[in-house]
Amino acid sequence: MAWKSSVIMQMGRFLLLVILFLPREMTSSVLTVNGKTENYILDTTPGSQASLICAVQNHTREEELLWYREEGRVDLKSGNKINSSSVCVSSISENDNGISFTCRLGRDQSVSVSVVLNVTFPPLLSGNDFQTVEEGSNVKLVCNVKANPQAQMMWYKNSSLLDLEKSRHQIQQTSESFQLSITKVEKPDNGTYSCIAKSSLKTESLDFHLIVKDKTVGVPIEPIIAACVVIFLTLCFGLIARRKKIMKLCMKDKDPHSETAL
């Protein structure tokens, strides 16, 4: 009996070691999205749709699945949650570029697979295409741009590459805009400025019409105010002097009558 007990204990230890060293994939649930177990990027285009199917593998019980769009949870129908779940992303637009969809295991949300949309589209340009400014003032031409892949940006003037003057021209570029600043505009700055965006998909352009008008000669307010004050004071002094003169004449007219009465 002692020998049998020893054999049973050794077999139990062996089985315990086997279980401990089994690969995790064989003992825990694994998620797949469209057959992929790792996060991945899905290439797509505007106007298309994408179907994302999440499934749980190696499960020993029914598993609830959750879908998230960025940080917001997606509402799923009751029959679209257990062991397998799908979402359809329809009418994909340029604004969906970079958006992530994540499938998570309900009981352990650290188990997840994410899909990031890579929406490719040619450059889209917009901006205030007509500006009138006074000579000597500053102006900014802002070309709003959206593109994926990112476009190479340039400024043209009257169909030729703009010759930048370091002292007067400044270019600023962000992921969403391409800006040309001109300080102290001059009459030769008149013309059509073109915002050019070149990508591997297409080249687009947007024209900005700049009109430089003569500088308005402002009427100096201070001299006018000073002149009005002088005129006002002159009139006041004139009235005072005239009043004194009238009073003297009245006094002279009054004196002869007084002597006659005596």
From Swiss-Prot:
| Gene3D superfamilies, alphabetized | Immunoglobulins (2.60.40.10)
Primary localization class, coarse: membrane
Subunit structure as annotated in this protein's UniProt entry: Homodimer.
Per its UniProt record, what PANTHER family does this chain match?
A: IRREGULAR CHIASM C-ROUGHEST PROTEIN-RELATED, NEPHRIN
Recorded GO CC terms = cell surface; cytoplasm; cytosol; mitochondrion; neuron projection; plasma membrane
Name the species this protein comes from: Homo sapiens (Human)
Q: What does this protein do?
A: May control cell-cell adhesion, cell migration and proliferation, cell morphology, and protects renal epithelial cells from oxidative cell injury to promote cell survival.
Glycan-linked positions: 58, 83, 118, 158, 190
Which top-level group of life is the source organism from?
Eukaryota
Q: Does the keyword Metal-binding apply?
A: no
Which InterPro entries does its entry note? Cell_adhesion_signaling (IPR051275), Ig-like_dom (IPR007110), Ig-like_dom_sf (IPR036179), Ig-like_fold (IPR013783), Ig_I-set (IPR013098), Ig_sub (IPR003599), Ig_sub2 (IPR003598), Immunoglobulin_dom (IPR013151)
Q: How is it modified after translation?
A: N-glycosylated.
Write out the entry's keywords from A to Z.
Cell membrane, Cytoplasm, Disulfide bond, Glycoprotein, Immunoglobulin domain, Membrane, Repeat, Signal, Transmembrane, Transmembrane helix
Could you tell me the membrane topology recorded for this protein? Single-pass type I membrane protein
Listed as disulfide-bonded, the cysteine pairs are 54-103, 143-195
Q: Where can this protein be found?
A: Cell membrane; Cytoplasm
Q: Which residues lie on this side of the membrane: Cytoplasmic?
A: 242-262
- Sequence ranges on the Extracellular membrane side: 30-220
Q: Name one Pfam family in it.
A: I-set
What this protein is called in its record is: Transmembrane and immunoglobulin domain-containing protein 1
Q: Which GO terms describe its biological process?
A: brush border assembly; cell aggregation; cell migration; cell-cell junction organization; cellular response to hydroperoxide; intestinal epithelial cell maturation; negative regulation of apoptotic process; negative regulation of epithelial cell proliferation
> Membrane-spanning regions, if any?
221-241
